[in-house]
Amino acid sequence: MTTVHPGTGAPADAAAPQVLGPAPVPGRLARGIRTPDGERFLADLAGTRVRQNGCAAAAYAALYANVDVITAYPIRPYTAIMMNLAQFIADGLLDAEYIHADGEHSQFSAAFGAGSCGARAFTGSSGVGVTYGYEMYSIISGARIPIQMSIADRTLDPPGDFGSEHTDALCTRDMGWLLGWAATPQEVFDKSLIAYAIGEDPRVLLPQMVVQDGYFVSHIAGEVDMPSAEQVDAYLPPYQLPFPLDPRHPVSHGPQIHPEQGPPLQLERARAMEDAIPIIREKTDEFAEQFGRRYPHFVEEYMLDDAEMAIVISGGHAVTCRAAVRRLREQGIKIGMARLLWIRPFPTEDLQRALRGVKVAGVVETNLGLGGASYGGILSLDVTTALYQASGERPLVTSFMAGLGGETVPVSEFEWMAAKLGQALERGSVEKATHWVGFE
């Protein structure tokens, strides 16, 4: 038996590992082959614009990606993603194994096993489901198995209010997964394809979390442009894992090792996350060339050219933030918005460039980081670290706890944040590290 280090492939003197072709289930198609009904369905969709919510957009992206294995366990608000995929399989539109697990730990374990065999695997969850399967995150990324997980954010218990909050996904931020938020159903669809293309690239080989705000994005319909299957296949070819579990070419995954063998593997995983940065740029540009929709690589810069103040945000509340920025600009207030599209890898240099010239920045925290340095949220810890490393003048930074428990963040609250930033600009210092919006 040959032991293969994740990411290195088989030894040079060994026969080239082969990706398994037809799945060992009678009647299954070969990997990468669409069903006849699926081909006709996607042909009819090509070039159309449909109204669908974020859950449907994630499911359609998995259909276009022609995933091989889906592992599911229901928990709202992400459940509709798996309901749609189950219907696709029942209607003969998708040839995939659908595994209904007994809980999220088993669900993610099954996706890991499928991905280890060379299958394009898809899974997902929300809220406490994300945390229930926590053990598997480091295992999957450490084995360099690029499965995809679609998360519809939900508040952790307590208080059990089931609203949208980013804490669930951010709890996993240091486990070696690519992690990014989508702000609209169109972006959910597009980012799901982009994330697969990045994670499956042999220069990266990392799992991905594509996150959307529960209910605000997952359940509110928006317009989504549907491509042709040929476009998607050209951008995202059939997945080929360099080191699949294959009885014809045995390898070992996850063997026990000596302590001194551990640090090199951890270093390799850290470097893989750094190495993903140029690949994210590359795959985002390739997507624009193939589909005609261009996204910022890491940071959306909105009205920041001459801004003295900036709101730093991620997720769906950025849509409302843009409206607030436009209204404030009409009043002569020089404010802009920096939206983070990826949290891991964190876009340190891109954020530094986006906020150059800005004198004070406020980070919107739709999450809870109890006892942290700012005694508020999680995101500001990365933002302040990134800005502290910048050369020259750095903006003052404060944070705003808003949207917790799934509350809306209306334009009026963004205007309140802008007023606080304006006061800090006049004083030359921030009043406090964290403001709780609606409680002051």
Identify what each model region corresponds to.
Residues G27-G32, E365-E440:
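Peripheral docking tails and interdomain loops at the edges
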Residues T2-C171, G176-W177, L193, D213:
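Thiamine diphosphate
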